[in-house]
UniProtKB/Swiss-Prot annotation:
GO molecular function: DNA-binding transcription factor activity; DNA-binding transcription factor activity, RNA polymerase II-specific; protein dimerization activity; RNA polymerase II cis-regulatory region sequence-specific DNA binding
Polar residues: compositionally biased ranges: 220-270
Gene: e2f4
Region (Dimerization): 82-177
Top-rank taxon: Eukaryota
SMART domains cross-referenced by the UniProt entry: E2F_TDP (SM01372)
Residue ranges the UniProt entry marks as DNA-binding: 12-81
Region (Transactivation): 299-375
CDD domains: E2F_DD
Nucleus as UniProt keyword: yes
Subcellular location: Nucleus
Name under which the protein is recorded: Transcription factor E2F4
Bias (Low complexity): 280-296
Length: 375
């Protein structure tokens, strides 16, 4: 009888099969951290003498897309983890494919609806009867906002718009809009002007020469024009003599309706000069008062070359007194007069030193534009 110790234990054919080794290898791979497994460690764990069998398993699994090689002796699992039901994953995949097909069908329906809408819009715009209804004109906008003031504002890009909290004065709220632009001018237009009223008169400040020298309107009955501060500028004559004495009234501030009076001392030394009368701006107003007989209108010179021959001290004295008359109060009355009534001033009120810049006798163009001169 043979010794039991001498008997060799031979494994069965099932234990040596490649299928059983593959199942053990896949289980070991699924349990590895992050699905990464070292082939040398797997061969030692599975007690595989021939590593060729491990390589055969990895080649098959890589071919069907369940694993991928990370390095020469390292692989990573790409399939489902342990405990996952393959049947549930297959059912979920079928549901996702059905949902995707439904979404594609809805997308086709939306594309068809868009084509129909575009064709309908084209049919409406191409119809001749609908041509006049494709836009809004001035009257359509004004009818929608009856009793309100509409202003069209066109400002460059980057304009700052501020609307302060409205102030409640006597039960009425006063709204203000502040616009500020550093890149270009801001244009403001009045939209809802009544078509039955007269056209607005837009006059710059100060008025141009053609408006001042326009022929006066002859009233049917004697009327007295309302004298406004504008008469102070229009009725101030240019000096007609090289040397004159100014009355005491001129040395004071110019009241309303007052004109300059000069005494001629050397009129015999000047030749005869063509003159033209200066029309008062009061004749432009449609007031019912008769002209004031105390208001005098002096002629002005039509030839500027004769004026330039006058002494510089006399011309400077005249313009100095003219600047004293043009104050901020005078400009305020100009803006509030009937001639400037249609204007809506959006800029700050004028001051006393807006247009009084000049050059001394020793200054030149370089001083005007601040151009440095290197000597």
């Amino acid at each position: 009888m043979a010794d039991p110790a001498q008997l060799t234990v031979t494994p069965s054919r099932h234990e040596k099969s490649l299928g059983l080794l593959t199942s053990k290898f896949v289980s070991l791979l699924q349990e590895a951290e992050d699905g990464v497994l070292d082939l040398k460690a797997a061969a030692d764990t599975l007690a595989v003498r021939q590593k060729r069998r491990i390589y055969d398993i990895t080649n098959v699994l890589e071919g069907i897309g369940l694993i991928e090689k990370k390095s020469k002796n390292s692989i990573q699992w790409k399939g489902v983890g342990p405990g996952c039901n393959t049947r549930e994953i297959a059912d979920k995949l079928i549901d996702l494919k059905a949902e995707l097909a439904d979404l594609e069908q809805r997308e086709q329906e939306l594309d068809q609806q868009r084509v129909w809408v575009q064709q309908s819009i084209k049919n409406v715009t191409d119809d001749v009867q609908n041509t006049g209804l494709a836009y809004l004109n001035h009257e359509d906008i004004c009818r929608c906002f009856r009793g309100d003031t509409l202003l069209a504002i066109r400002a460059p890009s980057g304009t700052c718009l501020e609307v302060p909290v409205p102030e409640n004065t006597n039960g009425q709220k006063k709204f203000q809009i502040h616009l500020k632009s550093t890149t270009g001018p801001i244009e403001v237009l009045l939209v809802n002007k009544d078509t039955s009223s007269s056209a607005p008169v837009v006059v710059p400040v100060p008025p141009p020469e053609d408006l001042i020298q326009a022929p006066p309107a002859v009233p049917s009955t004697p009327q007295r024009p309302a004298l406004t501060p504008q008469n102070d500028i229009a009725t101030s004559p240019a000096p007609t003599v090289p040397h004159s004495t100014i009355s005491n009234a001129e040395s004071q501030d110019c009241p309303t309706g007052q004109t300059f009076s000069m005494e001629n001392t050397t009129s015999s030394r000047l030749p005869s000069i063509d003159t033209c009368p200066l029309q008062s701006s009061a004749s432009l107003d449609n007031s019912n008062d008769s002209p004031d007989p105390s208001t005098s209108f002096q002629p002005i010179k039509s030839d500027l070359s004769d004026v330039l021959e006058l002494p510089k001290d006399m011309i400077s004295d005249f313009f100095d007194q003219t600047k004293e008359c043009i104050t901020s109060d005078l400009l305020e009355e100009l803006m509030s007069s009937e001639v400037f009534a249609p204007l809506l001033r959006l800029s700050p009120p004028p001051g006393d030193h807006d247009y009084v810049y000049n050059l001394d006798e020793s200054e030149g163009v370089c001083d005007l534009f601040d151009v440095p001169i290197n000597l």
